[in-house]
């Protein structure tokens, strides 16, 4: 997302992907809808799913504040406006492209305050070992992350994004990104990697242990 001070470095030789925060912050974010005008629908699906993950993980976060949640709420309202474009139900007009970028911008403003949480932390191993696109990999874990959250927080996120419940979100994820099968061995590796990062685990506002992480990862679930 725009307006964050974080870069992500992938090192294939080491099978590692991690975030690198810098003590810099952009003065300007260029939100020009023309950047998205020729993007294939699968690219829009994956990148807008990443933006949703930023927003949801910032809201359901131990570092969330009334101010960060104001950014999340604004971003989710913008994000919801472009769902039909990603679903292929209407064209990606210039206005729709700007709306998608604006949602991404609010996502960046949100995680700049809170950081991302467990879905992002679990996604890195999946991206490295299966080459799944980043946004799609984050979305892979979102349904179960939302299911673990406090019902009030979960319902706030889903309602703002225009979803009735976690299954409604999951149906959208499958329709746009598709749910690929990920080997349990890779998911178990994602869990073990995340357990070495207590700072990331601490950002989930509920008790987290290996059992919870395996549940969020969906280990043992049929596709």
For the regions a protein language model found, what residue spans apply to each?
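Short glycine/serine/threonine-rich phosphate/pyrophosphate-binding segments
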Residues: 1-3, 119
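Glycine-rich flexible loops
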Residues: 2, 53, 77, 101, ...
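Carboxylate- and glycine-rich phosphate/diphosphate-binding segment that chelates Mg2+/Mn2+
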Residues: 6-114
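C-terminal charged capping/lid subdomain of soluble metabolic enzymes
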Residues: 23, 158, 162-223
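Amphipathic alpha-helical interaction segments
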Residues: 70-74, 95, 99-102, 121-124, ...
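Glycine-rich phosphate/pyrophosphate-binding beta-alpha loops
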Residues: 108-133
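Active-site pocket-lining segment
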Residues: 125-181
